[in-house]
């Protein structure tokens, strides 16, 4: 069971002209940086979607969920397995699987929360930005789900 890190480079975070949060974001699974170590993308949009999808996955509403990056056709696919940890599949354009591994879903969820918190705290004066509001709401929902899942164990 592998631990997946979600990396957001705070030094690269900026607001685009359309008031979207952009910067370097990628995941680290084993020694692989995916899509790449310097992947520049719309961080807040990505994390907002990931928070929602992972929450649904943890609640058992989805057996399979895809977590997308905004630029390019790169995805992280979470697949529920019977009596095992979920499988994460990293796919590049044309659905080419470059890696898959069983992951610690609790750790991954907490990594998404930590990355989201970085963005929220990096732009305290911009809480009116839609993406940041969405992240804040989704963070609260995922935290509640993680508490509920941990109580059930």
Q: Each PLM stretch: what is its role?
A:
Residues 39-46, 81-84, 105-107:
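A short, sequence-level motif marking secondary-structure junctions
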Residues 96-153:
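Mixed-charge, glycine-accented linear interaction segment located at domain edges/termini
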Residues 44-52, 87-88, 110-113:
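Short, surface-exposed linear segments at secondary-structure transitions and domain or protein termini
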Residues 1-58, 62-64, 69:
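N-terminal low-complexity, intrinsically disordered segments
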Residues 30-37, 82, 90-103, 146:
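DNA polymerase sliding clamps and clamp-related checkpoint/processivity subunits
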Residues 22, 72-75, 100:
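Short, surface-exposed coil-to-beta transition loops
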Residues 65-85:
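Short, structured protein-protein interaction patches enriched in aromatics and acidic/basic residues
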